[in-house]
Design a protein with these regions (language model features):
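Generic alpha-helix structural propensity
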Residues: 23, 34, 38, 55, ...
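An accessory alpha-helical subdomain
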Residues: 124-210
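Nucleotide-state sensing region of NTPase/ATPase domains
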Residues: 44-132, 136-148, 208
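Short, mixed-charge, low-aromatic patches
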Residues: 1, 14-18, 90-97, 168
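Basic side chains
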Residues: 12, 36, 53, 62, ...
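Glycine-centered flexibility sites
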Residues: 24, 30-35, 64, 100, ...
Length: 211
């Protein structure tokens, strides 16, 4: 896959900029604060629809603008050219178009553009807690198979519902709440085991490269 051209509109510090890229190694050189990392962030956003800096959508929109646009011309491994356009709003409710056709779900874009980002923050994989390593594995699973994104979202949804129930009960569960908790626990075990299995398989695939 090749990103042939990248256009940014009101993304971070870019009011409007277009970058023509070629195959091979590309080096971006500039002064501090000119937007080198922002350029990499835009490419990464096309891949996972989130920032590798772990910031909200509001931070990606240039000051004074209502929305940001990332537009890319890509060539896939079969030589086919596609135009991808991602709109980012301050509320996070943007839209995605592929070849001028709007996707019903923004997350249907996952898997179209594949990137691998390495930054100093990635040292948290070693120095940080287990949550950082789980997030890394989950991101990799989604990159390998987009169906894993739905599984990850379901785990997050069930966990959120379960924790909300416990918080509302304040440690005092009546009969109805206990039944509901059992339902959420069973669902969490089900989807959690599927996600855990995917993580274990991925770790086994990575072992020859990190051992």
């Amino acid at each position: 896959m090749l990103v042939e051209q990248l256009e940014l509109v009101d993304f971070r510090n870019y009011q409007h900029a277009t970058f023509d890229l070629t195959a091979g190694i590309t080096c971006v050189i500039g002064q501090n604060g000119q937007g080198k990392t922002n350029l990499a962030e835009a490419l990464g956003y096309l891949s996972g629809l989130s920032s590798f800096r772990q910031v909200p959508a509001d931070a990606l929109v240039r000051v004074g603008a209502d929305q940001a646009i990332i537009r890319a011309h890509i060539i896939d491994d079969d030589g086919r050219t596609s135009l991808i356009e991602v709109e980012i709003t301050r509320t996070g409710r943007g839209r995605v178009q592929v070849n001028r056709q709007r996707l019903q779900r923004t997350r249907d874009l996952l898997g179209t553009v594949r990137t691998s980002v390495f930054s100093p923050d990635d040292l948290t994989l070693v120095k940080g807690g287990p949550g950082e390593r789980r997030r890394f594995l989950d991101d990799a699973l989604v990159a390998l198979a987009t169906k894993n994104d739905a599984l990850r979202l379901e785990v997050d949804r069930v966990l959120k519902q379960r924790n909300t129930l416990l918080r509302q009960a304040s440690g005092r569960l009546d009969a109805d709440a206990s039944i509901t908790l059992d339902v959420w626990d069973a669902r969490l075990v089900e989807v959690g085991e599927r996600l855990g299995h995917g993580r274990r398989v991925l770790v086994e695939r990575l072992q020859p490269f990190v051992a």
